Amino acid sequence: MENIRSFMSFPASRKVYVEGSRPDVRVPMREIALSPTKTPQGEVENKPVRVYDTTGPYTDPDFEPNVEKGLPLLRRNWIVERGDVEETEPQSTAGRAASLPFARRPLRAKPGKVVTQMHYAKKGIITPEMEFVAIREQIDPEIVRQEVAAGRAIIPSNINHPESEPMIIGRRFHVKINANIGNSAVSSSIENEVEKLLWAVRWGADTVMDLSTGKQIHETREYIIRNSPVPIGTVPIYQALEKVGGVPEKLTWDVYRETLIEQAEQGVDYMTIHAGVRLHYIPLTVNRTTGIVSRGGSIIAQWCLAHHEENFLYTHFEEICEILKQYDVAISLGDGLRPGSIADANDEAQFAELETLGELTKIAWEHDVQVMIEGPGHIPMQKIRENVEREQELCHGAPFYTLGPLVTDIAPGYDHITSAIGAAIIGAYGTSMLCYVTPKEHLGLPNKEDVRVGVVTYKIAAHAADLAKGHPAAQQRDDALSKARFEFRWNDQFNLSLDPERAREYHDETLPAEAAKTAHFCSMCGPKFCSMNISHELQRKIKEEGMKEKANEFVRGGSSLYR
């Protein structure tokens, strides 16, 4: 792997920390330095711009990255000092057999204790995690506590992932994005997946899901979690299926239960659980154009039909909650019957499952387990709003987490664009987190460059949604970049953008000279036709004419300051 710090850093940026009510609550932000504005009267300084930062310690000059050692245990003291946890021996077979460089006994809630952020919020406690996200979001900590207590927001924070920097998912906060990584049976390695993790958080992924289905699933996930400053999500049914040789009919509750515990002990922060795919919903998909497109949903459907039994994730849901609340693993209720084509959008199967997800949400909340709801999928623009409204009604305001949605099916190779259109719209309507889509969607396993394109595309969609919702901190960066653009501060334009390297690269293709970084034009219009340069001249003339008129008024009025 190339030098981590070099590829994680951003130009003209430095890591700064905002301290909370205690010395160990230090919230990272990226501060972008700006050049001064040049005026006829001299230079006027521009204040640096602070932006939300997901890069973790990797961009801290005092931190020495080493993937074999992992990250500092940021939250360990917060977790232990509450007095609700104890160290245990690994319960899972894989956990006991693992011989990895991260030697650590897993934590679990003490008997009779609950360790979820929702539990503490309901008790009126503002945890350090809540204060941390409040500073990040520039919002009052009490609002954070209230939203988590009501189930309208979640802070994914497994007690066995103390390396993670707390973040919040909810409609009152910044729209978040998730990036999917993970190996397959035919591609990738542990090193590649860790590199994709770092690449994803470098570009702004708020959470990362490890969807590995190939070899060394346990080991790959361990390296990802130990080196991740953001919450990690999984789909446990994938690993459970691997344990039974890839044959869905051989799945059992016991195999799945052990997988839940194994992943919870490792530190997985949220798990997609397809408990809403009920036996009697499966026939509703028969006449669909694209059937069941969710991997987890299709696995469960195959099991249900083979045994002609109800989904064991549905029948054992109370037990799932009992397990996960011991580690503060949030549940992401999977949309196993989501539409996989525009033709199937908003159909009976999709909304039948959504109603069940609402029932399961209430059960999870009774256990103080944090919940978010997964959503589609492939939805034409005119049907997007209904999805948000139904989810809010049926699922009692729980955060909505959607894959896109793609608004058309005709653009393989460009589905990061077809889905970002839908993502921006659904985010503006109130979706809390957007799962990215890369250009490789429907075509193959994404590589490092695909991850970059997918994350940046979805940061655009999420930010556009924040602007539409009127988030108080959203427009600061836009205004700073617009000002830099009008003043021809090219380097500041690049540095304020979501992808500075790409912006600089495109500019320098035609105007590579350093002198071009102060030119009052680009290659699009040239020096004679630049509208902003012409606007500068217009403003200058108007101001001059205005000053002349004021001077004439002064003379006509007797040249006296006092009348």
UniProtKB/Swiss-Prot annotation:
Domain of life (superkingdom): Bacteria
Keywords linked to the UniProt accession: 4Fe-4S, Iron, Iron-sulfur, Lyase, Metal-binding, S-adenosyl-L-methionine, Thiamine biosynthesis, Zinc
Catalytic activity, EC: 4.1.99.17
Pathway note: Cofactor biosynthesis; thiamine diphosphate biosynthesis
Cofactor(s) in the UniProt record: [4Fe-4S] cluster
Protein residues bound to Zn(2+): 378, 442
GO molecular function: 4 iron, 4 sulfur cluster binding; carbon-carbon lyase activity; zinc ion binding
Co-factor note (free text): Binds 1 [4Fe-4S] cluster per subunit. The cluster is coordinated with 3 cysteines and an exchangeable S-adenosyl-L-methionine.
Residues the entry annotates as binding substrate: 180, 209, 238, 274, 294-296, 335-338, 374, 401
Catalytic activity: 5-amino-1-(5-phospho-beta-D-ribosyl)imidazole + S-adenosyl-L-methionine = 4-amino-2-methyl-5-(phosphooxymethyl)pyrimidine + CO + 5'-deoxyadenosine + formate + L-methionine + 3 H(+)
GO biological processes: thiamine biosynthetic process; thiamine diphosphate biosynthetic process
GO cellular component, one term: cytosol
Name of the top EC class for this enzyme: lyase
Positions that bind [4Fe-4S] cluster: 522, 525, 530
Family statement drawn from the similarity comment of this UniProt entry: Belongs to the ThiC family.
Functional summary from the UniProt entry: Catalyzes the synthesis of the hydroxymethylpyrimidine phosphate (HMP-P) moiety of thiamine from aminoimidazole ribotide (AIR) in a radical S-adenosyl-L-methionine (SAM)-dependent reaction.
NCBIfam families: PRK09284.1 (NF006763), PRK13352.1 (NF009895), thiC (TIGR00190)
Protein name per its UniProtKB record: Phosphomethylpyrimidine synthase
Record organism: Geobacillus thermodenitrificans (strain NG80-2)
Gene that encodes the chain: thiC
